[in-house]
Amino acid sequence: MMFPQSSSRHSGSSHMPQQLKFTTSDSCDRIKDEFQLLQAQYHSLKLECDKLAGEKSEMQRHYVMYYEMSYGLNIEMHKQAEIVKRLHGICAQVLPYLSQEHQQQVLGAIERAKQVTAPELNSIIRQLQVHQLSQLQALALPLTSLPMGLQAPSLPISASSGLLSLSALGSQGHLPKEDKNGHEGDRRPDDDGDKSD
């Protein structure tokens, strides 16, 4: 009776290490698979983060470029406004020295110069658009060396958005140019009048 019990004990003890060995190996395989899955997810997330970082740097470059362009346009608008003020002051100083007939002609020309029609304004905006696009392309040339294929199509959109802001200030920035042209046209009859006198 003792021998079967000892044999059953030996068989049970020999079976347990095999079962433990099998479960440990299976657990290691599962851990390895999960680790590989996590590593693949980490790699994909790292690639996505690198892509987002590249897009962020591109947006920062565009922001700096547009800020510099906007600042330059603002300075130019103030410069043109100051030029118009000075030219208007010169006209006001010269006007009393003209004859009565020439004064009426000059005043009429000044009033006509202040009345800018929509077609004239559209023509001015188109000229500014061509000029701004050439400037944008010149500024964007160093940036196009990067692998960003969406830069070239985005230039007209940004230019049009800049023109929308310019159109709101058109009465302040573009009318002075017309006034200046009007004053230049007004000086010609004045000069003729001076020559005739």
Swiss-Prot record:
Recorded family membership: Belongs to the WD repeat Groucho/TLE family.
Compositional bias ranges of the Low complexity kind: 1-15
Organism: Xenopus laevis
Biased composition (Basic and acidic residues): 175-197
Record localization: Nucleus
Classification lineage: Eukaryota, Metazoa, Chordata, Craniata, Vertebrata
Ranges for region CCN domain: 166-197
Region: Disordered, residue numbers: 1-20, 169-197
Any one GO molecular-function label of the UniProt entry: transcription corepressor activity
Function description: May act as a transcriptional corepressor. Has a possible role in the negative regulation of proteins containing WD-40 repeats. May be required for the initiation and maintenance of the differentiated state.
Superkingdom, taxonomy of origin: Eukaryota
Gene Ontology cellular-component annotations: nucleus; transcription regulator complex
PANTHER family: TRANSDUCIN-LIKE ENHANCER PROTEIN, TRANSDUCIN-LIKE ENHANCER PROTEIN 4
Record's keyword annotation contains Cell division: no
Tissue specificity statement from the Swiss-Prot or TrEMBL entry: Predominantly expressed in brain, testis and ovary. Ubiquitously expressed in the developing embryo. Present in unfertilized and fertilized eggs.
Biological processes annotated in GO: negative regulation of canonical Wnt signaling pathway
Major location category of this protein: nucleus
Domain observations: Lacks the C-terminal WD repeats.
Changes after translation: Ubiquitinated by XIAP/BIRC4.
Protein name, as recorded: Amino-terminal enhancer of split
Assembly notes: Monomer.
Keyword Transcription: yes
Keywords on record: Nucleus, Repressor, Transcription, Transcription regulation, Ubl conjugation
